[in-house]
Amino acid sequence: MSERALLAAQGYLELGMVEEALSELASVSAKAHSDPDLIELRLHILMHGKRWNEALVAAEELLRISPHAVPGYIHGAFALHELGRTAEARDLLLKGPPLLRKDPTFHYNFGCYEAVLGNRDSALRSLRESFALDATYRDFAKRDPDLAAIRDALVN
């Protein structure tokens, strides 16, 4: 894989230049396109560009190649949620490896999905677990539109 192309793609991503970042990734050899790191970078770029269908395909590809890749579950679920497929997003998270449950993002996103699906108690449990693992998630929750229906219960 071309290190230059990878670095250029990362740089373009940091600048918010989605098309340029994807163009750099397209320039690497066909063999490199199955590299999990490259797929994960492409996934991040697609998510940044809010290209949810393509991001979901990249997440599925990452999980085929690397079935224990935590980002494949987290980002694949997020893409599903953004596509309005929140129940599928929740189910994808639940299919992840045990290591996933140590990640505060798992608990935060799961809590958001549960809140959207109307499962208040489960949402609150999961969100509180995310806060215990990483207190910065409490700040995210204050502004997250997915949590509007349960925001009052998140105060304590």
Stretches with model-predicted labels:
Residues M1-H48:
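Alpha-helical segment of the N-proximal tetratricopeptide repeat
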Residues L7, L41, H75, N109, ...:
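"A position-specific structural signal for the A-helix of alpha-solenoid helical repeats
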Residues A115-D139:
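TPR/TPR-like (Sel1-like) alpha-helical repeat modules
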Residues A132-N156:
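Terminal, low-structured helical/coil segments at or just beyond the last alpha-helical repeat
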Residues P36-T105:
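Alpha-helical adaptor scaffolds
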Residues E14-L15, H48, E82, V116, ...:
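Register position in tetratricopeptide repeats
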